[in-house]
């Protein structure tokens, strides 16, 4: 089996990012981004998706976190697109429900080749530890646009904003794991009647 790994560098006037990914990893993660809450959430993707992630980012954090969060999403999306290749033999679809105390979230993903995001998270607070939680919409939009996936995110209940977000990212990791997993019964076939994704 060919290695499903990727390394992406993305440099703009706002951020300089290096990201490496291994879709068939063990959940190892290393981050040097400068936004601790984002790093905590990315760790959920790695550990629950069994995806190795290594991300370094130097961003214009003196302004705010916006460019860093969005551009990390873009770069991770690009890395996924490279690592997954032609998509032959993958399950394509993934979904997960994840609870954390009072919070419950559902994430459904399709490696369809068609970018689309539906994200419904009724945050109970605007910030967690000084982090603007609205920025996660930018992270996921960046990911979707560059991984070329359809992604539905729903927080079904929750009163603690940290729990709401953490269940989203854990479910996202688990849905990714399911979708990118190779299906022996597919025997390298394209998971689409069109023959292309």
From Swiss-Prot:
Keywords: Amino-acid biosynthesis, Cytoplasm, Histidine biosynthesis, Lyase. CDD domains: IGPD. One of its GO terms (molecular function) is imidazoleglycerol-phosphate dehydratase activity. It is found in: Cytoplasm. It catalyses: D-erythro-1-(imidazol-4-yl)glycerol 3-phosphate = 3-(imidazol-4-yl)-2-oxopropyl phosphate + H2O. Its EC number is 4.2.1.19. It holds the Pfam family IGPD. Pathway: Amino-acid biosynthesis; L-histidine biosynthesis; L-histidine from 5-phospho-alpha-D-ribose 1-diphosphate: step 6/9. It comes from the Bacteria. Its main location: cytoplasm. It is an enzyme of class 4 (lyase). GO terms for biological process: L-histidine biosynthetic process. GO terms for cellular component: cytoplasm. Belongs to the imidazoleglycerol-phosphate dehydratase family. This is Imidazoleglycerol-phosphate dehydratase. It comes from Pseudomonas syringae pv. tomato (strain ATCC BAA-871 / DC3000). The lineage of its organism: Bacteria, Pseudomonadati, Pseudomonadota, Gammaproteobacteria, Pseudomonadales.
